[in-house]
Amino acid sequence: MSQSSASSIFTVSRLNQTVRELLEREMGQIWLTAEISNFSQPASGHWYFTLKDDRAQVRCAMFRNSNRRTTFRPQNGQQVLVRASITLYEPRGDYQLIAESMQPAGDGLLQQQFEQLKQQLAAEGLFDQSHKQPLPSPAKQVGVITSASGAALHDVLHVLQRRDPSLPVIIYPTSVQGVDAPLQIVRAIQLANLRAECDVLIVGRGGGSLEDLWSFNDERVARAIFNSHIPIVSAVGHETDVTIADFVADLRAPTPSAAAELVSRNQIELVRQIQGQQQRMEMAMDYYLAQRNQQFTRLEHRLQQQHPHLRLARQQTLLLKLQRRLEESAQTQIRLLSKRTERLQQRLQQVQPQGQIHRYNQRVQQQEYRLRQAVERQLNGYRQRFGIACSQLEAVSPLATLARGYSVTQTPAGALLKTTKQVQAGDKLTTRLQDGWVESEITQVTVAKKSRQKKVVTQ
């Protein structure tokens, strides 16, 4: 035996090891559809079974950490779709499969196609949030792409009629199930974009099995939704149903009824919001008017406090006080002089100086006359000054000016209107007259050429 022949001699264990490594390296993971037989589950929790078809069979194991993710209990005779790795059990030289996942064969194959298309479109960026279009708020016209005889259309129309009866709806009838359904859905989306009648589209159907909903997992439908210039809301099946169309659409609704609610306004809630806004506006207006009334009351009180009549009344009161004090002072002087005169008379009576008495009487009469003259002159002076002060106050009184036919006009800011530069057309003015106020609005502002001033025209 040559040396090269000796080096190629295998032991059984080496052979089994080499075959195992070759199988695992070359085959890797595969998808296999087959029928289950000889299913068993020992206390360890692992599953052991045989996968077979009508001409061959292979042993398979599914360990506990993998089979706990399976959503069903396998049964003998059941067709399944298995994702598994090929290996060799070295002690006996038996090759077998180690299953990683398992699904019922019918839905499982479709689910595999679903996952493959989902990964492909995601890699192309069709699911990216940056491509999502915002829904119009509010929508002016809604398009519905679904079966004309299906329950989904009835649900959508019922919700739209209840929430927003005035919202126009255009129906693009199409098949939603069967071989021709994907192409019809694509054409309906393209037609809606071509006619550009709607600003949002609802694409969907009612619930069903995975096969029933498969039209919305079609790649052509997904690309038509992605290329639509009109925002699309997907509404396929029930809340638990997920399709490729849901990932591509601008917004996914769990049901057709929910899609109708998303694209419509709730008129009852809208009326409630308007009523709330109206109530807040009325409260704000009441508060504004109350503040204005308080401001007018304060201004009226200040104006009354500065009224010339009040100032004249205060001056008159002061003058009366001075007059009383002067009279009291004069009477006090007279009483003192009278007492002094009486004392002098008593002294004169004792000495009977008739000549002196006569002279003193004359002097007393003269002093009394002078005193009365002085008091009268002083009173006349006070009266004259009081009259002059009253005339001066009347001359500068705003009310006296108003009584002569003039008026005082205030700008919206409350300042006195002196020049046309303070106002413009559309402003509202408040004018004070002799007997009240006038509210007016400026319709035109004209500048006088001679005096280079503006003429204010009010209505």
Swiss-Prot record:
Any single GO CC term annotated in Swiss-Prot or TrEMBL for this entry: exodeoxyribonuclease VII complex
Reactions mediated catalytically: Exonucleolytic cleavage in either 5'- to 3'- or 3'- to 5'-direction to yield nucleoside 5'-phosphates
Organism: Yersinia pseudotuberculosis serotype IB (strain PB1/+)
Disulphide-bonded residues: none
Subcellular location field: Cytoplasm
Name of protein: Exodeoxyribonuclease 7 large subunit
Enzyme class: hydrolase
NCBIfam families the record matches: xseA
